[in-house]
Amino acid sequence: EHLRQMPEDYLMTASSEEVALHIRLIRSFKDKLFILHHQFHEEGNYHNLTLCCPIGSEAFKKLVGTITAKSLNILGAQIYLKKDGIIIVSLQVEASTKADAEDLEIWKDIKNSLSQLFEGEINLQKILKSRIRYAGAQKKMAMVPRVHVERTAGNPFTVIRVEARDHIGM
């Protein structure tokens, strides 16, 4: 049943372990506002965060904003919209001195911030204003961000490519 509810490209992009995790998260979701799962991948030196919640709750925006507020580097993201109204957002976050393998406190703090966001106790702007900004070396050439949307008649999928200078939160 789970696979029938997912988009066509789901099995091409999600591993069997991820599919099993998504099924477990959805089963435990029930009457909660969201479910957040954290896992550290030692072989790639990154953290994987998976958020499961109802569509329309601005899940991607809230998760990315919360991670950005902690000045963590997002390496990749996957978003899956189920036909039954559930969204699954997975982010790969670089392990660093701010978020090493043993530091579970930062992930508890992120979960608490998400709880406050989903319950409406705080807004994302307030969380982002509290973040520490790190000044880097000035770039010599400005780069104009571009978004390319590619949709071809023979391909049922839309490819969105973003070109921009990389920085925390991008």
Model-identified regions with their sequence ranges:
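Regulatory modules associated with amino-acid/nitrogen control
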Residues: 1-170
